[in-house]
Design a protein with these regions (language model features):
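Glycine-rich flavin
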Residues: 13, 21-136
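Intrinsic disorder at enzyme termini
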Residues: 1-8
Length: 136
């Protein structure tokens, strides 16, 4: 039984590695570390153009319809490059949670915008009253 990546996934890895070598050098990462937002709109646009924010989003919502194994290939390379910004929280955490737990209306309203990079998701939890329920 072969547990390796497919030929397409290896091609995806090579493309990601080349893209990140060209667009996410250490100097850029250090600049983003010094930026309070750690977000660069031009870099985010490049990720969007590659389809990374929508990789796990179904095609019916404007995404790539990729698998978690496809995302693993991207995340491994992004981790090696220390990719700054909202990619991990939006594409890897928030999008799958919305796909699995969001209402049909939320999916219809938000997922296409996430796939286009227009909506950046994150993960948070709070009590219904709007607090975290911690007692100080």
């Amino acid at each position: 039984m072969d547990f390796g990546f497919s030929e397409e996934q290896e091609m995806l890895r090579d493309a990601a590695k080349r893209f990140l070598a060209d667009n996410c050098p250490t100097k850029f990462v250090r600049q983003m570390m010094a930026d309070p937002t750690a977000h660069d709109a031009a870099f985010w646009k490049k990720l969007v153009d590659l389809g990374w924010p929508g990789l796990l989003i179904p095609e019916s919502y404007g995404g790539q319809g990729g698998s978690f194994l496809d995302m693993t290939v991207i995340v491994e390379e992004a981790g090696k490059a220390l990719v700054p910004g909202p990619f991990f929280t939006s594409a890897l955490l928030a999008a799958p949670l919305l796909i699995e737990g969001g209402s049909d209306q939320q999916k219809k309203d938000i997922l296409p915008r996430m796939a286009k990079g227009e909506f950046i998701g994150t993960v948070a939890i709070a009590e219904a009253a709007g607090c975290f329920g911690f007692t100080v």
